[in-house]
């Protein structure tokens, strides 16, 4: 992966135009000419990796509660589009398998954020194993695995020495030991929060040899500033507004 390339990641797909983390949002990215998306992955009770941000169904579907006891067959009864608008009614929660198929068909690349599974270590390890297994089916598209849970990323690296890793940080936990964390993870990227990020920090990250992909950037002015500083990518809810920055 060329760390010098300036990338715009469609955050949860084009989540300002379509329901987040749905195939409609990912397809919108392709229609707009974007080459990278960001999405979130967690796991159902039967071991199926699904694309969803929250640990409950409440915010982004017509259902409620945890999905940790559900199975793949239950997805047919869950509407992940109506909350966004009536024109999106019936949009399902996608599986990671569906996304991998879509990536192979379109050439779309993805940053996949591993969610910090709340059901315990066993399901967390199962999530990692299932995700890595699905990614073996990729035929061409690039992928980055990221997480705020750096223990999960260490588990990823222990299982796979090659998959690119991006360590996510909120500004409150971006301590001076960031380099030690990245080295222990054998990570290729650091994903810092835009708020509080300075040019000097970006210079340090880049000088250490890491890709710097910043979240979440929704104005052309901030995007241009960050790219001028040398960041390699930005995550945006409105990527279509940044294409002609």
What are the roles of these predicted feature ranges?
Residues 1-245:
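Phosphate-group recognition and catalysis centered on beta-loop-alpha active-site segments
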């Amino acid at each position: 992966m060329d760390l010098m390339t300036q990338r715009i990641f469609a955050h949860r797909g084009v989540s300002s135009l379509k329901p987040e983390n749905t195939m409609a949002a990912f397809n919108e990215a392709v229609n707009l000419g974007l080459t990278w998306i960001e999405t979130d992955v967690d796991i159902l009770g039967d071991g199926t990796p699904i694309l969803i941000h929250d640990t409950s169904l409440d915010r982004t579907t017509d259902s409620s509660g945890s999905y940790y006891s559900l199975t793949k067959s239950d997805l047919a009864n869950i509407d992940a589009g109506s909350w966004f608008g009536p024109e999106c009614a019936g949009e399902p929660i996608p599986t990671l398998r569906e996304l991998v198929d879509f990536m192979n068909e379109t050439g779309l690349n993805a940053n996949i954020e591993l969610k910090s599974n709340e059901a315990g270590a066993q399901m967390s390890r199962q999530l990692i194993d299932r995700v890595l297994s699905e990614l073996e089916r990729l035929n061409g598209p690039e992928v980055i695995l990221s997480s705020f849970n750096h223990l999960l990323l260490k588990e990823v690296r222990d299982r796979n020495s090659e998959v690119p890793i991006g360590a996510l940080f909120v500004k409150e936990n971006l301590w001076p030991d960031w380099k030690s964390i990245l080295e222990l993870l054998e990570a290729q990227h650091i994903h810092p929060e835009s708020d509080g990020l300075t040019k000097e920090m970006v210079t340090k990250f880049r000088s250490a040899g890491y890709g710097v992909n910043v979240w979440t950037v929704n104005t052309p002015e901030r995007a241009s500033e960050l790219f001028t500083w040398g960041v390699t990518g930005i995550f945006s809810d409105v990527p279509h507004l940044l294409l002609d920055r």
